């Protein structure tokens, strides 16, 4: 096949090629703006053919002691040439041995990742909704709109829940979000937050950080209030109590891909991560 045998770094000028690959992979939530943000926040690599077309890509997102690998795509015309394996191995070499590496695998990619040294450590449940029903249980948590002075406490809550420092990414996401909601307890302490972002395909909820599934459901209801059209949320599978609340709110489960970590290294998390930014970013 006419592949240029050099893994190159991808930049903003390659976004159109990334957009084509995402379309081919059936990932409609990644539009031009979403991909530009990801390229700015992460390290992207890929292969070209001799015509200069991007025929594969991979994203590496560094969050301190936790790294995410995502958007691993190989053009269907160039599969089974070992490009995916070479891209994954290249990303692994970009991190040190003390860093946990996570990724969300497709069924097709799972054997590749397992051969590279990844192991399954849970799963992500993808939910969608076309007719939202508000969560009616009353709670003591107070919900307010985000203000700049909340950012320090928000990032501290996110670090404890996610296990990696996403402060730079969160600054960009909050600026691009439809809404950012803060949850506080009766003492006024920040105990959680949630974001909604409009993608080309859905109104997406995430990340959502909360001390309980009830507070997470309350944040989702606030973010969805008055909104129309398709909605999506991706939650870690261990939060089974939120599953029932999502069903009551009109969501249904579409898929449950596995989460993998490299060489049994996993971050320290406090269990408060109720929804991901995306499967690529965690």
UniProtKB/Swiss-Prot annotation:
PROSITE patterns: GNAT
Keywords associated with the record: Acyltransferase, Transferase
Enzymatic class: transferase
One Gene Ontology MF term: acyltransferase activity, transferring groups other than amino-acyl groups
Family assignment from sequence similarity: Belongs to the acetyltransferase family.
InterPro entries attached to this UniProt entry: Acyl/Acetyltrans_Enzymes (IPR052729), Acyl_CoA_acyltransferase (IPR016181), GNAT_dom (IPR000182), YitH/HolE_GNAT (IPR041496)
Name of this chain's protein: Uncharacterized N-acetyltransferase YitH
Annotated organism of origin: Bacillus subtilis (strain 168)
Membrane-spanning ranges: none
Annotated ranges, domain N-acetyltransferase: 5-140
Domain of life: Bacteria
This enzyme's EC code(s): 2.3.1.-
SUPFAM superfamilies hit by this protein: Acyl-CoA N-acyltransferases (Nat)
């Amino acid at each position: 096949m006419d592949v240029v045998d050099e893994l190159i770094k991808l930049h903003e000028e390659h976004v159109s090629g990334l957009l084509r690959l995402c379309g081919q992979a059936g990932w409609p939530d990644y539009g031009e703006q979403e991909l530009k943000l990801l390229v700015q926040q992460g390290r992207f690599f890929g292969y070209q053919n001799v015509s200069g077309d991007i025929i594969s890509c991979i994203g590496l997102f560094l969050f301190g002691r936790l790294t995410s690998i995502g958007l691993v795509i190989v053009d269907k015309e160039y599969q089974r040439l070992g490009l995916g394996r070479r891209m994954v191995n290249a990303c692994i070499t970009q991190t040190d041995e003390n860093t946990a590496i996570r990724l969300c695998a497709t069924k097709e990619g799972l054997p590749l990742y397992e051969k590279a040294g990844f192991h399954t450590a849970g799963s992500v449940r993808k939910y969608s909704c076309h007719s939202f029903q508000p969560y009616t249980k009353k709670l003591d948590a107070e919900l307010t709109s985000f203000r700049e002075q909340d950012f320090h406490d928000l990032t501290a809550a996110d670090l404890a829940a996610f296990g990696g420092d996403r402060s730079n990414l969160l600054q960009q996401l909050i600026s691009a979000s439809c809404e950012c909601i803060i949850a506080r307890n009766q003492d006024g302490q920040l105990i959680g937050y949630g974001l909604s972002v409009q993608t080309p395909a859905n109104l997406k909820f995430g990340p959502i950080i909360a001390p309980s599934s009830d507070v997470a459901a309350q944040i989702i209801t606030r973010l969805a209030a008055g909104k129309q059209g398709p909605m999506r949320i991706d939650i870690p599978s261990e939060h089974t109590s939120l599953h029932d609340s999502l069903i009551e709110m009109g969501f249904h489960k579409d898929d449950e891909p596995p989460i993998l970590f490299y060489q049994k290294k996993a971050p320290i998390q406090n269990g408060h991560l109720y929804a991901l930014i995306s499967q690529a970013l965690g």
